[in-house]
Amino acid sequence: MWRQTLFDGSDLGLSKPFQFTNLSSIVLPRMRKSMIFLASGELRAYLEKTGRSGGGAHGHLEECTRSDSSGKQFCLIKTSNLEDAGIQTEAFIQWIVQKTLEAEGLGSRVPRVYEIFRNENNSVGFTMHEVLDSKLCGRFLSESRTLERDIIHFLAQTAAILQRLEERLELDHRDLKADNLIISAKPSSMKWKGITIESPFTVHIVDFGFACMGNSGITQMDASDGTLPPLDPCPKEGRDLFHLIVSFYSIPSVRTQLTEPLRSLFSTWLTVSDKSCAGMAEKWLSTEWLYLITSQKKFSNPSCRPEAILQALGPLL
């Protein structure tokens, strides 16, 4: 179990092994004047910002070139707009998620974390691999000429990734939507219990700022920094894929092109406790309403479990 495991954080520049139960006591590398120094004072990496940046309400992203003893890498720097705001927990969750997938041969599906550091003002940030030649899923869908096929493969790839993470880490992303998937042009091949997913593109999951990891449904690690209820069970059955499916269905150009049998599958997936959420997804351009549903302690949608999605999509792949 990850809670009792002592992790080697040397690839993050940490001098000592750590446990997820004591993240606050970890001595992080320091960033000064675009240089990252280890606790020993040794220079670890130099960051050269390219000038392009972006972000949202809970974090800021900047593109940069990272140089270390192994060469140069294109990466992103993520810092918080608020004081820490759980960004240290977010970074460590993304790190263990990527490491877990790497052991399965799927390490590229979540950007690698290079280091987690403290700035000169003592706030926390981290650097991560940048997925090049990629598009946000929402934009990819708007440009797609094979929309239904692409949706089937988006959902199948994402479900195969989440199934592994739920099984090994009891992880919920809790903010999975079209624009938290990045699509790169590299072909993908995945397998799950006899189902083969051969796709002309690769799905990458990003932004773990609301993620949690649990233990028999009890949240143990929470990156949301109080944004979500502290007793919110983790994981919740079907939550992540329900979020993603609602975000797809809320795009008018997507739902109007759905045909059978995918239309019927969406109808099933959008039903929670015998009540359809399709009407709300059609009415509201924003998907904020769905968090009122999934934040309920007893939320459950068995049809949106990763295994259920994969079984439903298997005949369509």
Predicted regions and their residues:
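Conserved structural core of kinase catalytic domains
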Residues: 105-149
